[in-house]
Amino acid sequence: NAFAAVELIHPGTRANPEYYDGPIWGPSAGPGHLGKDYSELDQETIDYIVERFGDAAEMAKLGGVDIVMIHAGHGWLLHQFLSPLNNRRTDKYGGSLENRARITMEVIANIREKCGDDFPIEVRMSGTEIVEGGLTLEDQIEFAKLLDGKVDLIHVTSGTFPVPSTNQHMIPNGFLPQGCNVYLAEAIKK
């Protein structure tokens, strides 16, 4: 028997203005990578996003999906909050790793509230951003400790879309050694 899974994601600053002409949001304001600047998320919009993740998981469950995966890696919104490269906030969503992880933890809690404790949740994370000043393996080990007991599966890769040289680690190709991200998963699993 195969299991059906759905990936839940918000692009944050990676939203493409060619396909989306609404506001582009990130943890902090800044210049957009595709020519459209982005704004810092306010509390009301953060709450809205958290609720929509929960609603999407609930719809997936009602539709017969067996597990949801929250994408908190590769430079998407939840990862942007985690990354010191993107998150320059000074409120409860910035500064310490625990604060930068807060939105992801709120998403998980919202999904648990709407789908129950028996509905499996996977979190996909970058074990390291592979870029100076970015998330390190040590940071992500601490993030995994926050996830422990709250999710059912942690999926570890590496890299971040905003830094193209790391893309081959997100989707390993034939030029990298087989299992190139396994050392990250092993360290996080400990």
Model-found features: residue ranges?
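Flavin-dependent oxidoreductase catalytic cores
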Residues: 1-190
